[in-house]
Design a protein with these regions (language model features):
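Surface-exposed repetitive/solenoidal architectures
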Residues: 1-228
Length: 228
């Protein structure tokens, strides 16, 4: 699906995998599925991906292996391995989600971006998002809003974890880089090392207002310069 015409059907991979997916672009909304609108994607794996966006800024945003961006729908029992490089809203599996439930998914991708960069999802944005029973294990590098699982959130996260090393400059967290208003993190943890400069945390880098965190922990080494 494109930005103007998102994919609206349902896709069931029936447990199959796609190997050696290669994407090299300087455009926005790129992944196996560019954009989905209310679609259900389930039971598919992507192995040894190499997704690379050479552009910079929001004009080149939304990059993931499986899905670039969602508006509604569900993702269930999906995974990816490989390498992802992008600019804004970059994720090991999904670039960004809106009003979407992501369940039983994981990514082992090494992810590099600039802003809103996550090991699984770059930016699950909005109260209608739910991320449940998911994990990420790859390294994550970026500049701002960088998280081992999720880059920047205003959503619900339940029973999730991240184990990869995370590094960045501002709002850097082992699980979540930046948490905005009305988000909740429950029964989740991170174990990877975290290295940042401004707003750095083992679990969450920058915590916004109206947040709820319960039954969570972080065990990785944390290095920061200010607000750590």
């Amino acid at each position: 699906g494109t930005e103007a015409n998102g994919f609206q059907a349902n896709f069931n991979g029936n447990g199959h995998t796609i190997t050696n997916l290669r994407i090299n672009t300087n455009q926005k909304f790129f992944g196996l599925f560019g954009k989905i609108n209310g679609a259900d994607i389930k039971n598919v794996g992507l192995v040894n991906c190499n997704v690379n966006n050479t552009g910079t800024g929001w004009d080149h945003a939304y990059i993931g292996t499986l899905v670039a961006s969602t508006e509604g729908g569900t993702l269930e029992n999906c995974f990816s391995t490989g390498i992802v490089n992008g600019s804004v809203c970059v994720g090991g599996l999904i670039g960004a989600t809106h009003q979407t439930t992501t369940t039983n998914c994981y990514s082992e991708c090494n992810v590099t971006g600039v802003e809103n960069v996550g090991g699984l999802i770059g930016n699950p944005d909005g109260a209608g998002n739910h991320v449940v029973n998911c994990f990420a294990s790859g390294t994550v590098k970026g500049n701002k809003n960088v998280g081992g699982l999720l880059g920047s959130i205003s959503s619900e996260v339940v029973n999730c974890y991240a184990s990869g090393a995370v590094s960045g400059n501002e709002s850097v967290g082992g699980l979540v880089g930046s948490g905005w208003s009305s988000y909740a993190i429950k029964n989740s943890h991170s174990t990877g090392s975290v290295n940042g400069k401004l707003y750095t945390g083992g679990l969450v880098g920058w915590r916004g207002n109206a947040s709820i965190t319960s039954n969570c922990y972080a065990s990785g080494n944390v290095i920061g310069e200010k607000y750590t």
